């Protein structure tokens, strides 16, 4: 990125702002080694297990899953710190009153003691990122939420001059679309 900015035609004064920004990003990334293990399709998992979204049983099950995921992710980061060293700005004292770290300590006292001794390789190990496109590709729910709609209508832009094209909708700009019905993959399996 810095090489690309250097080759840009703008004057150095203009480029300096962007260069300083990217240098700060690079420094912070190296100091913390942020990473993120996350989930997708949890809503489908709950449905497949017959657990109603929002029920006490489903909430308890999800809490347990996320607790196991957190302990495994942070435990792996501790193992890496033992082998390669902790992230640069790791300081166990700064985290001693952190509620999340307290929950990790309660869930796995052994892992916590190793973390105190060796640190972690990564400042953060979990993420719940937006997975809308990924869930469309994998035909699953995007997270813990249930399916928004088990059946919905999609539009695909088409060239009306193509052979054998079917135009169902034309927008105010004159763009043509074919419409088709989509069934959520797991819902379609359930219907069979």
Where in this protein do the model-derived segments appear?
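Long, C-terminal-biased catalytic regions of enzyme "large/alpha" subunits
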Residues: 1-192
């Amino acid at each position: 990125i810095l090489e690309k900015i250097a080759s840009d035609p703008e004057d150095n004064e203009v480029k300096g702002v962007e260069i300083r920004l990217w240098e700060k990003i690079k420094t912070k990334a190296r100091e913390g080694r942020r990473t993120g293990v996350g989930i997708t399709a949890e809503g489908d998992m709950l449905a497949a297990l017959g657990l109603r979204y929002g029920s006490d049983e489903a909430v308890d099950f999800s809490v347990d899953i996320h607790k196991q995921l957190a302990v495994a992710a942070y435990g792996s980061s501790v193992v890496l710190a033992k082998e390669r060293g902790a992230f640069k700005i790791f300081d166990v004292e700064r985290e001693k009153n952190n509620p999340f770290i307290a929950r990790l300590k309660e869930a796995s006292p052994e892992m916590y003691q190793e973390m105190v001794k060796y640190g972690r390789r990564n400042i953060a190990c979990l993420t719940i990122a937006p997975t809308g496109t990924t869930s469309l590709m994998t035909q699953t729910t995007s997270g813990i939420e249930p399916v928004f709609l088990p059946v919905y209508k999609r539009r695909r832009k088409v060239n009306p001059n193509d052979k054998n094209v079917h135009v169902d909708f034309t927008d105010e700009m004159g763009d043509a679309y074919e419409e088709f019905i989509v069934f959520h993959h797991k819902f379609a399996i359930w219907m069979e």
